[in-house]
A protein has these predicted regions:
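Active-site-adjacent elements of ketosynthase-type condensing enzymes
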Residues: 117-125
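A short core secondary-structure module
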Residues: 135, 139-176
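Short secondary-structure junction/hinge motifs that connect adjacent elements
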Residues: 16-38
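Internal helix-loop-helix
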Residues: 7, 37-106, 147-153, 165
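Buried hydrophobic positions in well-ordered alpha/beta secondary-structure cores of metabolic enzymes
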Residues: 10, 62, 92, 111, ...
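Single conserved hydrophobic/aromatic residue that forms the stacking wall/gate
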Residues: 174-191
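A short, Trp-centered hydrophobic/proline-enriched beta-strand micro-motif
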Residues: 105-113
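A structural signal for short hydrophobic beta-strand segments in well-ordered beta-sheet cores
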Residues: 127-130
Length: 191
């Protein structure tokens, strides 16, 4: 039933619009909203935070069908869950309440790991975060952040203790400012 619903959604909403989204370089926010309303984008969010509490198998079935409609849409619609996984597995109760509940309500999140000089090689990232009072100051550059111009919050991977190697990496949650002037620059994409 879940797989069937995802396939029907992909056939009706995704596949007919994929070429236009690519041609116009548009983020498919309205279609993502519709997928969210059907429950296709929150299957792994635990029930206590408003999701369905299902597993990877169910999510894979959905992603496969959405990807059938358009792999680009599967990536765009999946970026929020990618940013949410670290919270599901290691977030504090406060973080889960604050961010996962927002995901269940339809917000968009972005996963910020890739860097200009490191690509997606996590071990080679150079972004650092330094504690300044109660907040962290993040210094570095991230790129290829799916949905960044539409995200309500960001998962940012940075070193808080470079000398400790991978154990000195931290996941920071950054709530998107509005307006986003100066925060983002758009790079042309081709599909």
């Amino acid at each position: 039933m879940l797989q069937e619903m995802a396939h029907e959604f992909a056939a009706a909403e995704v596949q007919p619009n994929a070429a236009k989204w690519d041609r116009d370089s548009n983020f498919p926010r309205e279609a993502i909203r519709k997928a969210h309303e059907l429950g296709l984008l929150t299957v792994k969010i635990p029930e206590e935070y408003g999701g369905y509490g299902m597993g990877s198998f169910e999510e894979t079935l959905i992603c496969e069908e959405i990807g059938w409609g358009d792999p680009g849409f599967a990536t765009a619609s999946g970026s929020t869950m990618l940013a949410s996984y670290p919270l599901i597995t290691g977030g504090t109760e406060d973080q889960k309440q604050r961010y996962l509940s927002k995901v269940a309500d339809g917000c968009i999140a972005s996963y910020c790991v890739t860097e200009p000089d490191a690509g997606s090689d996590v071990q080679s990232i150079s972004t650092q975060a330094v504690l300044d009072g109660d907040d962290y100051v993040i210094n570095g550059s991230k790129m290829w952040i799916t949905g960044a111009g539409h995200a309500d919050w960001f998962f940012v991977l940075a070193y808080t203790d470079k000398q400790a190697g991978y154990k000195g990496m931290s996941c920071l949650l950054y709530t998107s400012p509005s307006p986003r002037d100066g925060l983002l620059s758009r790079m042309p994409s081709s599909a």
